[in-house]
Amino acid sequence: MSTSNDPVVSSHDPIKQEKEQETDLEAQVEHKKRNERGNAFVGFLILIFVYYLLRGGSNDNDKQEMSHSPGSCMDSESAAVSTSAKCYIPPVLTPAKEPKLGDDVSGIDYIRSPEFFNDSLVRFQELLRIPTVCYDDMGDVGDDDRFDIFAVFQDKVRELYPNIFKKLKVEYVNTYGLLITLEGSNKDLKPLVLMGHQDVVPVNQASLDRWYFPPFSATYHNGHVYSRGAADDKNSVVAILEALEILAISDYKPEQTVIASFGFDEEVSGYRGALPLAHKLYERYGKDGVALILDEGGFTINLFGTLFATVCVAEKGYMDVHLKLKTPGGHASIPPPHTNIGLMSKLVTQIEEPFGGELTFENPFYTTLQCFAENSADMDDNLRQLIKSGDTEKMTDLFSKSRLYRYFFETSIAVDVINGGVKVNALPEETTLAVNHRVDASKGLKQVYDRYGGLLEEFGHEYHVNVTLFNGETVVEYEDAIGHIFASTAKTLEPSPVSPYDESSDAYKKLAGAIRYTFGDGTSVTPALMPANTDTRHYWNLTSNIYRWTPVSTNSTSKNSFNGHTINENMRYDAHMDSIEFFYNFILVSDSGEEA
């Protein structure tokens, strides 16, 4: 694990120069911090969810819902340890060989040097300052000039990492997809693929006055680098580049091929970036032709007195449902019992009825809880007892009382967009509705299709409205109908396969072994479920070993932790250094790891 050494102080020290400029900002920044509530970070980060819920950081409703003791859900005599899900923690793995930069400087020593600490910061900042923003309405590459900024980004990558471009194979896929290959000597070994994405989400212009520093300034302040993209996902992209550059400088010749695959539109589902990259790899290596894929995902956090690294081994499914209701217009002085908007509002209240869910042994979240209970130093005894009992019915009842927990085993419902009406005093003729669902991994998209099929048919009969479902079939049809509702979908994705995380998986052993080597042998590597989706959705045919984990540690009690996708996004710089060290270690361990 990298040391948190302060930057070297010299006449040319960029951090010192920035710190001097920041001194006058200290008071106002701290004032802003005291007057702003930090977000819980990205909703899909399981450990932060767990910490806030069980440590009292969730909202008041959640605290009230969970205030009763978990012990009240069960008799103490019934607490038998479940054998349905084991918390397997692989051994620490160390590299059998390590490259040298010169006669007596190892790669890891160089990464931990003050010189590298300073120089790497400058490179990180330079790439963060390029606003590689991806918007929901992006057109195709070549037709939409908003993609041109990625050429600027890649020119800077070429300038900052010259040895990668001199010694490794670099390819551009669909213009801006970046594929870097460090060829291995043993062609019988399947390659290791490290993923990241170059794009970032837009900055809400109305929020600029709430940023401590301009969102693309990449300002270093109090050990943090503030910038859009610092946490999602340029931290990983830059860390992988740093690791590969060091290996290129050292002329490292691995047995296993190592590939970096960087998309450029992950924030809008990756169809122009990750999908063509995945196709290229499939053409080259074939079905199941890759050993392991690692992309962004869970974090490492100190929870219940233990350091947990939550490696997401699966993702929930995804569906956007679009509904369009058409009715006759007219003068508002003679309205029907329900206007178009009124009818759609009736439907919304029905749509928002929860799906309900059930925590099953097969759900990775069940194993997450088992690992917490088995390895945490100071978890509440009643909660530990409940989890280890394996009583999924009582666990479901308890955890479903909080919105922070329930969506790890239940399909979510978010009515996000509604539009209707054009003028006061004119009856609306059309209302549209968009609903987002993250689909329960145990149910699949069929659950959502079936739910809407029944719900819309019942709605149509109740309000005398014709109904056409997703497949174009009209299931309710009246000659004198007062309207017609149409259902369609835009983006859909079945829940991902579950990647292996037991003793039989060499891939999981290597990943977990490298994590524990980097972050310490006291780290509990824990499988988890990803409620959100990543670019890995396009890579399923390449391997069954797909893992989602971001190699940084975070302190969830800090209001200043990362803030991905929102104001004051930042990365603790020592956490970024840990990322570099991890990717460097992981490449070596995957190639030649041995038990410590």
From Swiss-Prot:
Which residue ranges does the entry give as Lumenal-facing topology? 59-596
Q: Which is an annotated Pfam family here?
A: M20_dimer
Where Zn(2+) 2 binds, per the record, is at: H197, D232, D295
Free-text cofactor note: Binds 2 Zn(2+) ions per subunit.
- TM segment ranges: 38-58
Q: List the membrane topology term(s).
A: Single-pass membrane protein
Q: Which UniProt keywords apply?
A: Carboxypeptidase, Glycoprotein, Hydrolase, Membrane, Metal-binding, Protease, Transmembrane, Transmembrane helix, Vacuole, Zinc
GO CC, sorted alphabetically, is: fungal-type vacuole; fungal-type vacuole lumen; vacuolar membrane
Q: Which residues form the signal peptide?
A: none
The region called Disordered is annotated at 1-31
EC number in record: 3.4.17.-
Please note every region of biased composition (Basic and acidic residues).
13-22
Task: Look up the record and name the cofactor or cofactors this protein needs.
Answer: Zn(2+)
Q: Where does Zn(2+) 1 bind?
A: D232, E267, H565
Q: What InterPro entries would the database entry show? A: Bact_exopeptidase_dim_dom, Pept_M20_carboxypep, Pept_M20A, Peptidase_M20, Peptidase_M20_dimer
Q: Give the positions the UniProt entry annotates as the active site.
A: D199, E266
Q: Which GO terms describe its biological process?
A: protein catabolic process in the vacuole; proteolysis involved in protein catabolic process
Stretches assigned to the Cytoplasmic side: 1-37
- Where mainly found? membrane
The terms under GO molecular function for this entry are: carboxypeptidase activity; metal ion binding; metallocarboxypeptidase activity
Q: Which CDD domains match?
A: M20_yscS
Residues glycosylated per entry? N118, N466, N541, N555
Q: Which family does it belong to?
A: Belongs to the peptidase M20A family.
- How is this protein named in the record? Uncharacterized carboxypeptidase C24C9.08
Organism listed in the record: Schizosaccharomyces pombe (strain 972 / ATCC 24843)
